[in-house]
Amino acid sequence: MKVRPSVKPICEKCKIIRRKGRIMVICENPKHKQAQG
């Protein structure tokens, strides 16, 4: 999980979702998991 000021999808399987007011990227690849804030 990376926490970044700006989150971007890395591959075509990355999905952007909102969870508890945070923008997150979830993906099949665990290295692509990101959270904003």
Curated annotation (Swiss-Prot):
Molecular function via GO: structural constituent of ribosome
InterPro entries: Ribosomal_bL36, Ribosomal_bL36_sp
A cellular component term, taken from the record's GO annotations: cytoplasm
Listed GO biological process terms: translation
Top-level taxonomic group: Bacteria
Record keywords, A-Z: Ribonucleoprotein, Ribosomal protein
Keyword field contains Ribosomal protein: yes
Similarity-based family: Belongs to the bacterial ribosomal protein bL36 family.
PANTHER family, per database record: 50S RIBOSOMAL PROTEIN L36, CHLOROPLASTIC, LARGE RIBOSOMAL SUBUNIT PROTEIN BL36C
HAMAP family cross-referenced by the UniProt entry: Ribosomal_bL36 (MF_00251)
Protein name according to UniProt: Large ribosomal subunit protein bL36
Organism classification: Bacteria, Bacillati, Bacillota, Clostridia, Eubacteriales
